[in-house]
């Protein structure tokens, strides 16, 4: 199998083309293993589609399926344009709906669409939380110090609510810093696009930031978010790392 390794904002992905749908959970787990496989936060399979430029299957590091991945969608769009020679303005089908993307050399902007749902704030484990669905569910806690991030606490919240867990610090009305514990990876990752989107949207909804901000994830790779016409737009650089062939075990 020919595969391509991509990185976006600190998340890394294994991407390949396929001509039909099938359950690739075991393969995803094997490929994403950082000790015995290629290593990655996710596995993306690009499939043909009659109506849209393509359709994807997205698998988490542990082999579970995910409806959406923000950084994964940007990596997929970069791959589709630069490798599969698809038009730089494209739309593709995910489990969370249609994603629109624009590729400009190494920069990719995607629309995460309309926010699926937002729940009221609540208190748990000594912290204030809010749940926001940006294609996948995210718990968000606003804090003054990102050192509050606690993996064990995140594990408890993730298991109870079946959601990703984010800690966010507002630096000013145009800049946020975010740390995310991702389900499916079951650990903190260097970045999470849908998580950053959830943090930005809730901050904007609560009138703490402008409708256009920069966000710095743990990786330090700054990305941009904009909210306009009830849609959430996400832009940042994408890196093609390498391509190779993989022999199945």
Swiss-Prot record:
Keyword set includes Isomerase: yes
InterPro entries linked to this entry: DAP_epimerase_AS, DAP_epimerase_DapF
Binding site for substrate: 11, 60, 70-71, 164, 182-183, 193-194
Reaction(s) this enzyme catalyzes, per UniProt: (2S,6S)-2,6-diaminopimelate = meso-2,6-diaminopimelate
Record-annotated active site: 69 (proton donor), 192 (proton acceptor)
Any one annotated GO CC term: cytosol
EC number: 5.1.1.7
Site for Could be important to modulate the pK values of the two catalytic cysteine residues, residues: 138, 182
Pathway(s): Amino-acid biosynthesis; L-lysine biosynthesis via DAP pathway; DL-2,6-diaminopimelate from LL-2,6-diaminopimelate: step 1/1
Matching Pfam families: DAP_epimerase (PF01678)
Gene Ontology molecular function, alphabetical: diaminopimelate epimerase activity
Keyword set, alphabetical order: Amino-acid biosynthesis, Cytoplasm, Isomerase, Lysine biosynthesis
GO BP term, pick one: lysine biosynthetic process via diaminopimelate
Superkingdom of origin: Bacteria
Protein location: Cytoplasm
Cited function: Catalyzes the stereoinversion of LL-2,6-diaminopimelate (L,L-DAP) to meso-diaminopimelate (meso-DAP), a precursor of L-lysine and an essential component of the bacterial peptidoglycan.
Description of how the protein assembles with itself and partners: Homodimer.
Family that this chain belongs to: Belongs to the diaminopimelate epimerase family.
Name used for this protein in its record: Diaminopimelate epimerase
Organism for this UniProt entry: Campylobacter jejuni (strain RM1221)
Gene name per UniProt: dapF
């Amino acid at each position: 199998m020919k595969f391509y390794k991509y990185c976006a904002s600190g998340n890394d992905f294994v991407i390949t083309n396929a001509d039909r749908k099938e359950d690739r959970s075991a393969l995803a787990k094997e490929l994403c293993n950082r000790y015995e496989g290629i290593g990655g936060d996710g596995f993306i399979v690009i499939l043909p589609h009659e109506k849209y430029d393509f359709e994807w299957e997205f698998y988490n590091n542990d082999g579970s399926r995910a409806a959406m991945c923000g950084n994964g969608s940007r990596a997929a769009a970069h791959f589709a344009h630069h490798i599969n020679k698809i038009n730089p303005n494209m739309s593709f089908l995910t489990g969370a709906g249609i994603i629109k993307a624009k590729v400009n050399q190494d920069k990719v902007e995607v629309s995460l669409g309309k926010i699926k749902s937002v729940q009221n704030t609540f208190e748990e484990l000594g912290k204030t939380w809010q749940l926001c669905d940006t294609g996948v569910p995210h718990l968000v806690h606003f804090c003054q110090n990102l050192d509050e991030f606690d993996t064990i606490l995140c594990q408890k919240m993730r298991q109870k609510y079946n959601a990703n867990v984010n800690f966010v610090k507002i630096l000013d009305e145009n800049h946020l810093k975010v740390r995310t514990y991702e389900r499916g990876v079951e650990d903190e990752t260097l970045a999470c696009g849908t998580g950053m989107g959830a943090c930005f949207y809730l901050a904007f909804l609560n009138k703490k930031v402008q409708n256009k901000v920069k966000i710095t994830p743990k990786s330090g790779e700054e990305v941009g978010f904009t909210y306009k016409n009830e849609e959430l737009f996400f832009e940042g650089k994408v890196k093609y790392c390498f391509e190779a062939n993989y022999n199945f075990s």
